[in-house]
Amino acid sequence: MNKMNQLVRFVKDTVAVRKPQSEDKSYLPIPSTIGGHEVNSPFAEPTAPSLGIIQPKCKRADWLIKSHLTITTNYEIKEWETWDRAISDILDLYDGNPVFKPILLFVYYVLAYNARKIPGPSNGVRYGAYFDELTTVWHAIPELMNQEIDYSYNHRVLHRKIQYVISFKIQMSSTKRRTSPIESFIEVTSEGLKHTPQFTTILDRARFVYSLTGGRYVIHPF
């Protein structure tokens, strides 16, 4: 059997994306909460009214996202904290396009959050997740439209006697087909890992900048 077919697929949620009320359906106003807190600007910093700072618009991007994540270890991982210590290295080691960084790492954490045990080497344990979906992402990244991107991340790390081999691959291409919101793919928590927090808690620990409105994630620049 093809190795990729052994990876666990997400169950596709067919909930339609709510259409914005503005005339331009690719944009929404920035919500007034970021990370659950009230803010007066997109940077969560107080500013003088006389400065006339213009808040960036929230944009909709529709992509076909194909991505997979595999993590091979020499010991079974039992708690999220141990898992998170290894997967979070990418926050410092990411070497791709900086404009795409918030989106790519968001998908990376979705995969890490949904990873399952899959067949692997006889002398180790392998976890994996596979994503191949037509996806809507709302964001407030001015330079980002529906550009295509291809990124790979391969990393080895030793932490507390546990060896991790991490492989992450993602391809994103623009689509005009019917899509599902990215938040519909993050309902399931990691299998067998104790003390797995809510996904928003994981994003906060990784210092993501995002807002939530009506259950919709809006991804901001780092």
From Swiss-Prot:
User: Origin, by domain of life?
Assistant: Viruses
Its keywords, alphabetically, are: Host membrane, Host nucleus, Host-virus interaction, Membrane, Viral budding, Viral budding via the host ESCRT complexes, Viral matrix protein, Viral release from host cell, Virion
> Can you list the GO cellular component terms from the UniProt entry?
host cell nuclear membrane; membrane; viral envelope; virion membrane
| Single GO BP term | viral budding via host ESCRT complex
> Molecular function (GO) terms listed?
structural constituent of virion
Specify the protein name. Answer: Matrix protein
Q: What does this protein do?
A: Plays a major role in assembly and budding of virion, by recruiting cellular partners of the ESCRT complexes that play a key role in releasing the budding particle from the host membrane. Condensates the ribonucleocapsid core during virus assembly.
One protein family per Pfam: Vesiculo_matrix
Sequence motif PTAP/PSAP motif, location on chain: 46-49
As for subcellular location, the record says:
Virion membrane; Host endomembrane system; Host nucleus membrane
Complex and partners: Homomultimer. Interacts with viral nucleocapsid. Interacts with host TSG101.
